[in-house]
């Protein structure tokens, strides 16, 4: 690794795992992963909310359907799965569902509201 890449990776790791024992990630850290292409983003809001606007290339599975549809993400199980909703409440539930199924999932703190404020 070159000297420019190492600090970025350390920074992402600190932000990503900064909340000890909690499966969370800040919107700023999530944006870094998004920009690097090293994560899949899961929108757990309703279809209407998703259609009104979402993170580009995100996967949409409403949290109410996730217990039956989580297999759609099976090929990304070991990747970073960033779960988001509007503010972070539904995504916490979605994250817990995925964690129980063995996914490497993180709840994006503040949801889409914080994402939009982090650019």
Q: Which residue ranges define each predicted feature?
A:
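Rhodanese-like catalytic fold shared by cysteine-dependent sulfurtransferases
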Residues: 2-6, 16-39, 48-80, 86-119
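Helix-termini ("caps") and immediately adjacent flexible loops/tails
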Residues: 7-11
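Structural scaffold elements adjacent to functional motifs in cytosolic proteins
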Residues: 41-43
């Amino acid at each position: 690794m070159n000297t420019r890449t190492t600090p970025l990776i350390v920074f992402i790791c600190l932000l990503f795992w900064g909340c000890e024992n909690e499966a969370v990630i800040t919107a700023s850290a999530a944006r870094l992963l998004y920009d690097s292409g090293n994560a899949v983003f899961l929108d757990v809001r309703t279809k209407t909310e998703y259609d009104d606007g979402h993170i580009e290339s995100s996967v949409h599975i409403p949290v109410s359907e996730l217990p039956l549809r989580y297999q759609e993400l099976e090929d990304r199980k070991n990747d970073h799965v960033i779960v988001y909703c509007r503010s972070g409440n539904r995504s916490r539930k979605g994250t817990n569902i995925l964690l129980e199924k063995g996914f490497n999932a993180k709840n994006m703190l503040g949801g889409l509201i914080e994402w939009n404020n982090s650019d």
